[in-house]
Amino acid sequence: MAGGAWGRLACYLEFLKKEELKEFQLLLANKAHSRSSSGETPAQPEKTSGMEVASYLVAQYGEQRAWDLALHTWEQMGLRSLCAQAQEGAGHSPSFPYSPSEPHLGSPSQPTSTAVLMPWIHELPAGCTQGSERRVLRQLPDTSGRRWREISASLLYQALPSSPDHESPSQESPNAPTSTAVLGSWGSPPQPSLAPREQEAPGTQWPLDETSGIYYTEIREREREKSEKGRPPWAAVVGTPPQAHTSLQPHHHPWEPSVRESLCSTWPWKNEDFNQKFTQLLLLQRPHPRSQDPLVKRSWPDYVEENRGHLIEIRDLFGPGLDTQEPRIVILQGAAGIGKSTLARQVKEAWGRGQLYGDRFQHVFYFSCRELAQSKVVSLAELIGKDGTATPAPIRQILSRPERLLFILDGVDEPGWVLQEPSSELCLHWSQPQPADALLGSLLGKTILPEASFLITARTTALQNLIPSLEQARWVEVLGFSESSRKEYFYRYFTDERQAIRAFRLVKSNKELWALCLVPWVSWLACTCLMQQMKRKEKLTLTSKTTTTLCLHYLAQALQAQPLGPQLRDLCSLAAEGIWQKKTLFSPDDLRKHGLDGAIISTFLKMGILQEHPIPLSYSFIHLCFQEFFAAMSYVLEDEKGRGKHSNCIIDLEKTLEAYGIHGLFGASTTRFLLGLLSDEGEREMENIFHCRLSQGRNLMQWVPSLQLLLQPHSLESLHCLYETRNKTFLTQVMAHFEEMGMCVETDMELLVCTFCIKFSRHVKKLQLIEGRQHRSTWSPTMVVLFRWVPVTDAYWQILFSVLKVTRNLKELDLSGNSLSHSAVKSLCKTLRRPRCLLETLRLAGCGLTAEDCKDLAFGLRANQTLTELDLSFNVLTDAGAKHLCQRLRQPSCKLQRLQLVSCGLTSDCCQDLASVLSASPSLKELDLQQNNLDDVGVRLLCEGLRHPACKLIRLGLDQTTLSDEMRQELRALEQEKPQLLIFSRRKPSVMTPTEGLDTGEMSNSTSSLKRQRLGSERAASHVAQANLKLLDVSKIFPIAEIAEESSPEVVPVELLCVPSPASQGDLHTKPLGTDDDFWGPTGPVATEVVDKEKNLYRVHFPVAGSYRWPNTGLCFVMREAVTVEIEFCVWDQFLGEINPQHSWMVAGPLLDIKAEPGAVEAVHLPHFVALQGGHVDTSLFQMAHFKEEGMLLEKPARVELHHIVLENPSFSPLGVLLKMIHNALRFIPVTSVVLLYHRVHPEEVTFHLYLIPSDCSIRKAIDDLEMKFQFVRIHKPPPLTPLYMGCRYTVSGSGSGMLEILPKELELCYRSPGEDQLFSEFYVGHLGSGIRLQVKDKKDETLVWEALVKPGDLMPATTLIPPARIAVPSPLDAPQLLHFVDQYREQLIARVTSVEVVLDKLHGQVLSQEQYERVLAENTRPSQMRKLFSLSQSWDRKCKDGLYQALKETHPHLIMELWEKGSKKGLLPLSS
């Protein structure tokens, strides 16, 4: 340990005489023996030199505590003069990099290489001889620092043959370095290459050959150059000299003996040695944490751009973003062991050296939340005052400029806090003592020091549940090591070049382990195991393919010749108790309670399993992952006592579910370890370690039913757990349960896990891997979506392509947006030639392909007989590439039907070859050549091919804006000659560049993804189109439906024509339309008859075949023929007794009794209220319950959609949606809910009723009817902000001058049948004034879930408003039947109008009243707003609809023009009057 207390201590001990040094060691040994009951190893006397004694003391107690013990011992020895001089020297030595001296108020100056360790030479005691000085000088470093490390390493290793010699990181970091390489050099960061073939992410360096020794020499040379430039030498592995890393056992952590250190950890590698082993991590800045939707969704291109992440350097964490604003809160989020805590501490240390944020922050404070949780009450002033690095300035002065303060909160999610929003209970002043969580809640809630900045580390992405005030935070995900960083890590860990090469080669040859090593903690674990084998001169072997087996290997090596089975069981029990109690620090009493005494504790400390924290004395596992690993072993080892009839796996499941909750269950390392330990290999290793036979009751296959209930098909964490088992039989059974999958994959490790598990699924049809395309509002059925921010290396492309060889059901592969090397393309083409590869669609848009790649693709297509669609858009293929493809496409055996070559750098030179394909290919039906410079010459050549009698093409994509008028006329003539041919153009030029790779392939699908995105999750027509695909002509249902598939209004490059208003055309009129209770179908609204209001019985006659939707209920029918249907809304109460057992099912929707002619209904879409948006609920758990005379029968639905359950060819009886549950999981099911607000005006006051219910139309209707009886009127307000949870309690509050008491103040979200009394809150307002603000919050964490402003205008019925110029009035009953323009294109307008608010503003006061305007705005999506607007328009006359048409024309001219143009082609509308 170069410098700091170690250097000073070594200097003064070297000055002691031999007899004094011996006495010094004996006194220390006596002190240590007096504490041996606490598990400390007694100090060992008879060290031969002061240097050795200093090394031992620092290794055993930590720098600061070793220094304090030395001072105290010198006083006992009577060396008061030496003690005083040492204290004085320490107090005036700010140059020590890690001494407890105070930094200056300004940015710390950067030390030069000659000053790193020199100051303590001048602190030698008076009378120090020249010889002794020379003896010290011999140990000083040269400019590179290498000689110092060599000497200190040698001394430390010789002095401690039996002591631990490996320091370990905190809960988030391995012993080896894991932080970002920005601290290595503060010049400009390395610029990423723009070449599309780059195999590494920005910032990775030195792709050198490890076999030549150049790589190793290059690293050492770079370290020397840094030192020569004036930077301190950078780092050995976690603080111990490199040569000391010859044992498996790491040290416990010595901590400095100050109160500050009991709260804010200072770790033992806090020195130059650690920094020199620094290895770069990948940091990905995101607009939102992974798996969370953005707050505001805009059009699809903007939406994609908003959610695209980018790699970021640590120096830019607090830099301005695209909005030029600098963030105040930065959140470092990542998996366990990924390096977050190390990175956080490095920020503090780099700032202290003047290398980071010196111009931004004057003070930086690091707080470990693990330690902070131990404090009962503390004020911010006390916390800062106890920070050993704080300046001597008064606290008031430090806090006078909060904008210059940075608080680092490490592991904020570890203690299980809920850091509430500001309230009266939170502290408002920095001097006020508070519980630690309240203090942090006040800081983050901005009730104190609102201008301060924060750097927060956490595992979970659900921090907004813990800290509700994080809306403006900058999210940065720590992805781990890149390919080259992993390699560099190995070369820095092993200081011997030959050892480094051997270890690196061995691990890289194990592809699974090499992928797992992107997690720094796993890299450290692998290196440590190999180092131990080298030390023992054993043959190097490391066959682990999972993290579980690697941990078992580590433990087995540490336990050689040390049978500690019973003691290990006690340690496992301690770990499990900590997991249940969210506890990571254990007192000596905690250990004794589990049978762990001083000697055993000392053994575990030396083995590197536990670490000690001296003041106050406590212990923790060396890493939180180790605690989770031992906790998992505790579950497996637990005996059968007290288990009763429950299976072991159920007990294990209940314990982990209790500890982590259903949302965190599969993301927890404990669950992964548990499944890994239950695998065959895991059981064998555990039996060898514990020398026992494990219980036969713990069979991995027993987990299958429970996992099928709990596993989330869109959860990568679930696949991580399955991967740990690597059991084919187990995986086949579990994966067969998945019917559709969708997930986000961003690293080699995640890709490995995903592709491994997919091999065992029989239902996955589509595999999509697109860079930067994280969020989608809809998922295609049976689809896996893979997203990456770092280019996949060739080795892992091969792993991915191996899936195609074994998964015969995979039909579609989308790799758009990923940079493919030439080697990767060759691997893919070899796969395409395999007979077992049955791909039908391949999308490679924006993959950086070249003409040479086209040659390989043509070769791959030669043997493939199944591929029908190929998308190569946005690649610079050039004419040469197109010619290679044409050679294959001309062959009669080629089955390709669709080829997309958008923006591929093509010119007229390749058009002759393309024309020959058009005239020769028997299968090609669609060719997209947009955004290529074909000009008139090239297009004329294409026309010759199109006129050939053998041409089968029916769709041709061309940009016509660059063509001459003569050429355009020729194309129109060609379309007349060939009626089946459609020449389309739907992309704006320059929308995308060849490297962007947006969803070009899906844009041209018969049902485009662009269209699906705009339709959104609530558009019923999307369900209709799917349901009618086989038997119905969609164009008959929605006459203009295919227009949306042909073009997009925002990208049509045509001039706007002057289209007259439909009001001026005498043949356009309206027909009588229905009310909100009507169905909507192919012919418009269909009236619904109320047969029996008391029984909620309705009758409707569907006049023709087609799809019909009931907006008020969400119910949908797909009819084969005209038929009359009766619908009765029932109550569940009378049938619940037939559900056995009751607790295993949850009611998830209304109960309906439908009567219809058998066979007349093709499909029915029944609404449900389970929130599926986040992918937290397994859709296979849904069942349709039929109640017949013989009892309840369950039917598996044909499919589960976002808001509906679909039954095909249904048989009818009372039926409703149920969700299968497990014990105690009800509170984890997200529910779509609504807040119903009613009011009644009295002379003196206004009475309000507020309901919080699941979104069930039958319950809502029952409440409406009840409130109407008491003359209450509903006020329409938006639904809750997020899904809520059954059984949770929510508080209702309000603010306003006339607001009276709310009774009750709490509501529980629960399901009560429509016939039961529903829970509601009642309150009175005496004087409404300008309005009252109502809020509903989660009682547990005070999270705001609903908010609304009630204004006086809300209380006035619409009929009382003064009608404006053209307020909507009913249409005359004798109006002709031809639909108005806005009615004819109703579904198109609902799906594609994006600027709804602008349209509403134009209608406000002219067509819409204030109440109607707010009702429309209250809907939560644009399609819902448009649908509500159209429900109001049903009673409008022609002038009102003309007003809507005019507003739409002004807001969306391209859309209106397109609808007119397409309608005129079909004879539906004239182009002019």
Curated annotation (Swiss-Prot):
Enzyme Commission number, as recorded: 3.4.-.-, 3.6.4.-
In-chain residues carrying the UniProt-annotated modification Phosphoserine: S93, S99, S101, S107, S113, S132, S163, S168, S170, S173, S179
Clinical note on disease: Vitiligo-associated multiple autoimmune disease 1: A disorder characterized by the association of vitiligo with several autoimmune and autoinflammatory diseases including autoimmune thyroid disease, rheumatoid arthritis and systemic lupus erythematosus.
Variant or mutagenesis effect after changing L155H: Risk factor for VAMAS1
Effect of R1415D: Abolished formation of an inflammasome filament together with PYCARD/ASC
Protein name: NACHT, LRR and PYD domains-containing protein 1
EC main group: hydrolase
Disordered: annotated span: 90-113, 160-254, 991-1017
Outcome of substituting K1277E: Abolished ability to form the NLRP1 inflammasome
Annotated source species: Homo sapiens (Human)
Domain FIIND, residue spans: 1079-1364
Protein's cellular compartments: Cytoplasm, Cytosol; Cytoplasm; Nucleus
Binding site residues for ATP: G334, A335, A336, G337, I338, G339, K340, S341
One GO cellular component term: nucleus
Effect of L1281E: Impaired ability to form the NLRP1 inflammasome
GO molecular function: ATP binding; ATP hydrolysis activity; cysteine-type endopeptidase activator activity; cysteine-type endopeptidase activator activity involved in apoptotic process; double-stranded DNA binding; double-stranded RNA binding; enzyme binding; molecular condensate scaffold activity
Record lineage: Eukaryota, Metazoa, Chordata, Craniata, Vertebrata
Outcome (variant: Q171A): No effect on cleavage by HRV-14 Protease 3C
Effect of Q130P: Inhibits cleavage by Protease 3C from Coxsackievirus B3 and HRV-14
Phenotypic consequence of H1186A: Complete loss of autocatalytic processing and of IL1B release. Autocatalytic processing can be restored by treatment with hydroxylamine
Record GO biological process: activation of innate immune response; antiviral innate immune response; apoptotic process; cellular response to UV-B; defense response to bacterium; defense response to virus; inflammatory response; intrinsic apoptotic signaling pathway
Effect seen on changing Q87A: No effect on cleavage by HRV-14 Protease 3C
Motif ZAKalpha motif 2, residue range(s) on this chain: 177-183
Effect caused by changing H1276G: Abolished ability to form the NLRP1 inflammasome
Effect listed in the UniProt record for changing D1383R: Abolished formation of an inflammasome filament together with PYCARD/ASC
Domain Pyrin: 1-92
Effect of substituting W1460A: Does not affect ability to induce programmed cell death
